[in-house]
Regions:
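Conserved N-terminal phosphate-binding loop of PLP-dependent enzymes in the Aspartate aminotransferase
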Residues: 1-388
């Protein structure tokens, strides 16, 4: 509800931060218990909840050792520092129009000549992004190899599907090829599933058998309480811990005073143990499939050159057909004026999509009736646009 008492169906869900839903009773109970009964909201010491959460993350994603932060952005930043220190290489390779929060190095896109340049809106960047980063188009394995072959890439940091420029899915074999290339050119692989966690209980990493050296996630795993985390493979963790010359205890540039605090850990345990379960994921994915199929049917009914992609519990349409397979092509398909009109029309009738793009996300309490309501209003939008 808003301050005027208007009720909304929320498909934005805090741009994934509320994928567990709003005010989940299990999460509320855990938070209240921590605040009122257990106390110690920030202690700089681990809790039993932290141990449980790390074990659950290992079960889900297959990664051995975990360290916590307050955002996935910070988890990415700290992972970048570690891989640079371990490899001795200065640059990180990204996909054009990727999303890794506000990490400076990630705000790079391919330029018209095929090289890198600052992404539009990269305000106040500390250095030219090409000094710290390299870039390739998603699904362009030749471009990926070209950049890795330059020999200065410490790691590829990637979403296994682009999520902030539409949902750009990997072409068959692409993710496996990237992993093979990182090994060929002695670079590490960091997979950020902060958004793509919607794919499955164990994200795309478990679903698709991915093998990252570093795994990053945040947003949804604590039910809306600030959290992020990065995990290291057994091999990489041993390399990091074996580097006694790295000051990782105090001023190493990795870690934070509030990271892993008891409140975040209590919320994360409740979310992972009782809300984002295998059963709820199955329900959420089924609803997203229904959303995708019914929205696509509207495109067909009105002969619109639009398309929609689904990634587990999320789906998103673009004003292009077929759906773009690179970040640049997806960016070129954007129509911000049309997007704003659709979002405003829906919002004025009680339906929220994710701002800045057309993503709909399901949570455990989303219903078929919610999707049907969206479709009813969305068809009204289409009719107005088509002059029907």
């Amino acid at each position: 509800w808003d301050i005027d008492g208007n009720e909304y169906i929320d498909f934005a869900l805090g741009d994934t931060g509320a994928m567990a839903g709003h005010r989940s009773p299990e999460v509320v109970t855990a938070i209240v218990n921590r605040v009122q009964e257990l106390g110690g909201l920030t202690t700089m010491m681990p809790t039993e909840d932290a141990e449980w959460v790390a074990a659950n993350l290992t079960e889900r994603f297959g990664i051995a050792k975990w360290s916590f932060s307050l955002t996935a952005t910070d988890a990415n930043r700290w992972a970048i520092r570690l891989v640079r220190a371990i490899t001795g290489k200065p640059k990180i390779l990204f996909h054009s129009y990727c999303y890794h929060g506000s990490v400076d190095e990630s705000l790079i896109i391919t330029s018209p000549d095929g090289n890198g340049m600052n992404r539009p809106g990269n305000v106040g960047s500390p250095v030219d992004v090409t000094m710290t980063s390299r870039v390739a188009e998603f699904n362009d394995i030749e471009g990926m190899e070209r950049e890795l072959a330059k020999g200065d890439v410490a790691a590829v940091l990637m979403e296994p599907a682009l999520t902030n420029i539409g949902i750009v899915l990997p072409e068959p074999g692409y993710l496996k090829a990237v992993r093979e290339l990182t090994r060929k050119y002695d670079a590490l692989l960091i997979i950020d599933e902060t958004h793509t966690f919607s794919a499955d209980w164990g994200g795309m990493t478990r679903r698709d058998g991915l093998e990252p050296d570093v795994f990053v996630i945040g947003k949804a795993i604590a039910g809306g309480i600030p959290i992020g985390t990065y995990g290291l493979s057994e091999e990489l963790a041993a390399r990091v811990l074996g580097r006694t010359d790295l000051d990782l205890i105090d001023m190493g540039g990795v870690g934070g005073t509030l990271a892993g605090n008891p409140l975040s850990m209590s919320a994360a345990r409740a979310t992972l143990e009782k809300v984002l379960t295998k059963e709820n994921f199955a329900k959420m994915i089924d609803l997203a499939t229904y959303y995708t199929e019914t929205v696509n049917a509207l495109f067909d009914k009105y002969d619109l050159p639009w398309s929609i992609n689904q990634l587990g519990a999320r789906a998103e349409y673009r004003f292009a057909k077929p759906y773009p397979i690179t970040g640049t092509a997806a960016a070129e398909s954007a129509d911000h004026e049309l997007e704003d009109f659709i979002h405003l029309y829906l919002a004025n009738r009680g339906v929220l999509l994710t701002p800045f793009h057309n993503m709909a996300l399901m949570c455990p309490t989303t219903t078929k009736a919610d999707v049907d309501r969206h479709n009813l209003v969305f068809e009204e939008v289409i009719q107005k646009l088509a002059g029907a």
